[in-house]
Structures are given as C-alpha cells and as structure tokens.
Regions:
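Nuclease catalytic cores
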Residues: 2-81
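Short amphipathic alpha-helical segments and their helix-coil junctions
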Residues: 10-20, 114, 125-131
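Structural alpha-beta junctions
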Residues: 39-49, 152-156, 175-190
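Catalytic cores of nucleic-acid endonucleases
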Residues: 121-170, 176
C-alpha cells in the first residue's frame, strides 16, 4: 500500500505544542484506518466486497467519498441520509459499502467461507504527548475488548495505527489474544498493514529504531 492522503496534518492545540515529531500533529483518523484496512482486504486477502460502518463523527473527520474516488471507486448507490453513505465500486468489480451504522463491526468482509470482522481505532501517530500516547494504548485495548465481547463468526482483528508504542503493546498482547482467537493488525501512515507476529514485530522495531 502507498496512500499519501490518509494522514491529516493539523497544528497542535497550545497544550500539545512541541509534543510531536515536527510542527504538526499527524492524525490517522479512525475512518482512515477503516479504509486502509478495507483496501488491504481487497488487495491481499481475496475479498471482493467489504463493508465499513463509520459513525457521524468519522464522516466529519474524513472525506470517504473523495478518498475512494481517487482510487477509482465510484458511488453506485446511496445508503442512509449522509452524503457519503453508499456502495462504491471500481472497474475490477470490487465494492466498498460505507454504511453509517454502529454495532455491526467497523470493517466486515466475507472471504471464502468465513467472515473477517475488524474493530478499528485512530490516533495521532507522531505524538509524544502522554495523554495522546495513552489514548493510542487505550484504543488497542478497547478494540480487543470489543472483539472479546462479540460472538465470533470467523476471523476477528483489532486494527489501530502503527507507532512504536502500539507496536510494543501489540507484541505483549498478541500471545493472549491468539488464545482468544483475536488477531492484531497495525496500519502505517501510508496504508501499509502489518499483521502482528512476534518475530515480525522484533524486526520492525529494529528497523524503526535503527538498531
């Protein structure tokens, strides 16, 4: 994946000035995480139709229609009362359905004879602010908790932004999550998706720290 427009760069509020790498905070919003993971399922997992279920706040933060349009996904039909809800299709016959409704799983797809269901969270990926780093931690814990509370129909995946802190936490959680049948995936700033496995995380940590 190489998407240059998933991250939204914003000036930090006064209490977070100087607490990010660079002058702007890089927000990887939850809606962007959903779309990146949906594209991952279409491109690498053999899915043909993926459904995402954002809420109203996600639609305010991220322009689903414009982003999908840049990837040759044209709106075929509308769903609900929002401007972005609907079915989007590309020339290859793949579809992404944007259905603004909670309680259905953030990203859902059927691949072969099983269902993939993902819960997603976003966050600021270049922050050093303790509160925002903690928010990234909580996001991963919340997604895992939601999946544990949901009856499994197939693969269950917790999906959050890739940062050094989420990578460390994911590595610690992965063994116990595996016992519960839950996978963890981390989304990078350009849409790359890493399935967390202990050997892989060690390699990625070394690459990110220059060790």
């Amino acid at each position: 994946m190489d998407f240059e427009d998933l991250v939204t760069a914003l000036a930090p509020p006064p209490n977070r000035v100087g607490k990010s790498d660079g002058p702007h905070e890089h927000h990887l919003y939850e809606g962007a995480v959903m779309l990146a993971f949906a594209m991952h399922l279409l491109r690498t997992q053999g899915a043909r139709d993926v459904r995402i279920h954002p809420d109203g706040e996600h639609g305010k933060q991220f322009d689903f229609t414009t982003w999908l349009g840049r990837r040759d996904f044209t709106k075929i039909s509308s769903i609900g009362s929002t401007t972005y809800g609907g079915v989007y299709g590309n020339p290859a016959g793949q579809t992404i359905t944007v259905h603004p409704k909670s309680g259905l799983g953030d990203v859902v797809a059927e691949v072969g004879n099983h269902v993939i269901s993902a819960e997603c969270k976003g966050g600021i990926i270049n922050t050093r602010h303790p509160g925002q780093v903690s928010r990234l931690y909580r996001g991963l814990c919340e997604t895992v908790g939601l999946l544990m509370a949901t009856p499994s129909q197939g693969r269950q995946i917790a999906v959050v932004p890739l940062t050094e802190s989420t990578l460390r936490l994911a590595e610690r959680l992965a063994p116990r999550c595996a016992l519960a049948g839950i996978e963890i995936a981390l989304v990078g700033s350009r849409g790359e998706v890493m399935d967390v496995k202990l050997a892989e995380t060690a390699k990625v940590m070394a690459e990110r720290t220059g060790a």
